[in-house]
Each structure stands twice: as C-alpha cells, then as structure tokens.
C-alpha cells in the first residue's frame, strides 16, 4: 500500500520527473578570470561596441528573476522566465501531457496558443465554451469541473482576464476549481492582462494550492512586447522541471537588460500611470461605442481592449482598414461571428477610431 502524499510532480510525465536536461556552460556557477569552457569567440563582434555580447547569457538571470518575483509576489524559486507566455504554455504542455493521452481543457472563445500547443503535443483538446448572457461572457465553472474530471484533463487553462472577451474570473470561482481538481490537474491561470483588472492576482493562492500555475508577461501593461519576457509562477519543484525542459539559453542579453530597466522604480511608476489612463479610456471608448447605431454590443472588459459586436462587422472592418486603423477580426472564433476586438489606445487614437466608425453611420445605405 502506497501511503506517500501526492505532490505536484505526480502530474508531470513520469519519464521527466528525474530528467536532468541539458547541462550548458552556464548551468553551473564557476569562478575564474579566463573562461575557455563554452567555445565562445575570444574577440567581440565589430558591431558590439560595448563588448558585452560574445558570451552566452545567464539561463535565468538572477537580478531579473528577483525583480519579477518581487513584482508578482512570489519567491524567485517559484518563477521561471521564458520567451513570452507562449513558451510557458508550451513547456507546461510538453512537461505534463503524454502525447495522444493526456487532455488539455480550454474555454473558447479564448487565446489560441493553448490549443495550438496541445495539438503540437498530440494532446486531446477539451472545449468548455464561455457562457454569453446579459452580464457578458463568463466561465462555466460547473461545466469546467465536470469536463475536467470526466476527461481526466491534466491541464486546465483559465484566461483571466480572458482574451478576446475581456472577462475576469472571480477568485472564489478559481479556488473552487482548484479545490475540486487537486491531485488530478494543473490549473493554469493566464494573467497576461492582470494589471488592467479589478480582480486581484491568484498568485497568493499558490501557498495553498501547489497545482496552481500563473502566467504573467511584460508584453502588455509594461509595453515590452518585442522583448519577449514572460513568467511562469508555480511550485518550485515544478519550476525546476520546466527549466530542464527549456532551451539552454532562452533569454538574449539585450532583452534582459531592457526588461531590468523597464522594472525600475521610475519605470514602474510610469507604467502604473499609463495603466490608469488605459482603464479610464476603456470606459470612455466603451460608452462612446455603445452609442453608435451600427454597434450591437460592447462587452465589459477587464483588459486593455474591448470586444464589440457590429450589425455589419465587415463594413466596419473595411472602413477602419481604409482609414489606416488596424483592429483584430474575431469573426472566425466560436460565438463571435459579428465581433471585432479593439485595443484601447491613447486618447487621440481612440478618438480617431470613433471618428471612422461615426462616419460609417453618416454614409447613406
């Protein structure tokens, strides 16, 4: 009889639980003033004026890891830095799902990379659609729990705030899912848009639920999308496994440097001011859109975007394109046959967007 208490590592693929991964030249802390261990060039490239790029970078830069952990409210050992949230999603699927066997649960309409990563791993995808009612879109928590249990899903992805619909999941509902699926699935909460939300982060719940995983990114509120810095926040043992599954040198030195500068106290103060402005503009833009005759519905949003249904989404889309305004066409997504997603821009950009849509109304049919 096995009386050993289950751990989060029991959810990892068995062959990876003791997987050592690749041991790179930077995997072990070494000291010395003459480094001849990684077959790097002895001279900098002529384009490298500061002579800082000839060495391989730190796999997990300690300073940046500490800054991100402080930002998100965890300890560094609970945080893995990756190339955007996309890499975190991919690592989780590869580490947890046995190909052709272990399902991944998603809640469409939702960010497509969860299903894409699952399909690349040949993991079955279980879909539990969001419910669209008078209050907007929301997660069907009882259906999520039932589907996860019935299918024996190993990963449950919850996007909160959800892209593209903008809805956030209340903490109490996430905790209900965590309580019910303890020991059977990792519950992954994607908080890419968390800075714009009224709902607090779920990171503090990690102390009680080691099967919780949180995804964060510097791409949205922190305006560093090109830098490609995302974080997986999870049980330290799981983070160690994911690191072994990760590429040896995932983080380019220039990206790390920009991220560290972007997380300085001064930069964080500017970011907070901009987030507040986006939240205010989100309300202004939403109210103005709702007054347009061609707009069928503007959904409440906890992100930096608005999902909008149009009487004629094609006409709205083409008018915006003709005016040089690019928005996201969502009509191929489940339940969104008439919807466009509009990013909240600066006040001037939002006013320009509204002017184009108002002009459509002025054109005789």
Swiss-Prot record:
It catalyses: L-histidinol phosphate + 2-oxoglutarate = 3-(imidazol-4-yl)-2-oxopropyl phosphate + L-glutamate. The modification N6-(pyridoxal phosphate)lysine is found at residue 220. GO terms for biological process: L-histidine biosynthetic process. It comes from the Bacteria. Its EC number is 2.6.1.9. Its cofactor is pyridoxal 5'-phosphate. GO terms for molecular function: histidinol-phosphate transaminase activity; pyridoxal phosphate binding. Keywords: Amino-acid biosynthesis, Aminotransferase, Histidine biosynthesis, Pyridoxal phosphate, Transferase. The keyword Kinase does not apply. InterPro entries: Aminotransferase_I/II_large (IPR004839), HisP_aminotrans (IPR005861), PyrdxlP-dep_Trfase (IPR015424), PyrdxlP-dep_Trfase_major (IPR015421), PyrdxlP-dep_Trfase_small (IPR015422). The keyword Amino-acid biosynthesis applies. Pathway: Amino-acid biosynthesis; L-histidine biosynthesis; L-histidine from 5-phospho-alpha-D-ribose 1-diphosphate: step 7/9. PANTHER family: HISTIDINOL-PHOSPHATE AMINOTRANSFERASE, HISTIDINOL-PHOSPHATE AMINOTRANSFERASE-RELATED. Belongs to the class-II pyridoxal-phosphate-dependent aminotransferase family. Histidinol-phosphate aminotransferase subfamily. Homodimer. This is Histidinol-phosphate aminotransferase. It comes from Xylella fastidiosa (strain 9a5c).
């Amino acid at each position: 009889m096995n009386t050993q208490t289950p751990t989060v590592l029991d959810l990892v693929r068995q062959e990876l639980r003791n997987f050592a991964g690749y041991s790179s030249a930077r995997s072990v802390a070494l000291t010395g003033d003459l480094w001849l261990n990684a077959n790097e060039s002895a001279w900098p490239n002529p384009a490298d004026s500061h002579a800082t790029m000839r060495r391989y970078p730190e796999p997990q830069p300690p300073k940046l890891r500490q800054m991100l952990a402080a930002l998100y409210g965890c300890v560094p050992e609970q945080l893995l830095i990756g190339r955007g949230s996309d890499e975190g999603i991919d690592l989780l699927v590869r580490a947890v799902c046995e190909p052709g066997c272990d399902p991944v649960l998603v809640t469409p309409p939702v960010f497509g990379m969860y299903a894409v990563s699952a399909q690349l791993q040949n993991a079955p995808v279980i879909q539990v659609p969001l419910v669209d009612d008078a209050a907007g879109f929301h997660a069907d928590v009882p259906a999520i729990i039932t589907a996860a249990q019935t299918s024996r899903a190993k990963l449950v992805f919850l996007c909160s705030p959800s892209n593209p619909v903008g809805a956030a999941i209340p903490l109490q509902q996430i905790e209900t899912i965590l309580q019910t699926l303890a020991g059977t699935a990792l519950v992954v909460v994607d908080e890419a848009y968390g800075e714009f939300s009224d709902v607090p982060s779920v990171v503090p719940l990690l102390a009680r639920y080691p099967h919780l995983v949180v995804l964060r990114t510097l791409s949205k509120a922190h305006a560093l999308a090109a830098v490609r810095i995302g974080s997986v926040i999870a049980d330290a043992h799981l983070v160690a496994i994911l690191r072994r599954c990760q590429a040896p040198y995932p983080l380019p030195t220039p990206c790390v440097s920009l991220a560290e500068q972007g997380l300085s106290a001064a930069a964080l103060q500017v970011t907070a001011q901009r987030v507040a402005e986006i939240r205010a503009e989100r309300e202004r833009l939403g109210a103005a859109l709702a007054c347009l005759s061609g707009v069928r519905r503007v959904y409440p949003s906890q992100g930096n975007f608005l999902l909008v249904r149009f009487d004629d989404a094609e006409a709205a889309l083409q008018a915006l394109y003709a005016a040089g305004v690019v928005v996201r066409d969502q009509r191929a997504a489940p339940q969104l046959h008439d919807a466009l997603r509009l990013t909240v821009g600066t006040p001037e950009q939002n006013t320009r967007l509204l002017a184009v849509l108002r002009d459509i109304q002025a054109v005789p049919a």
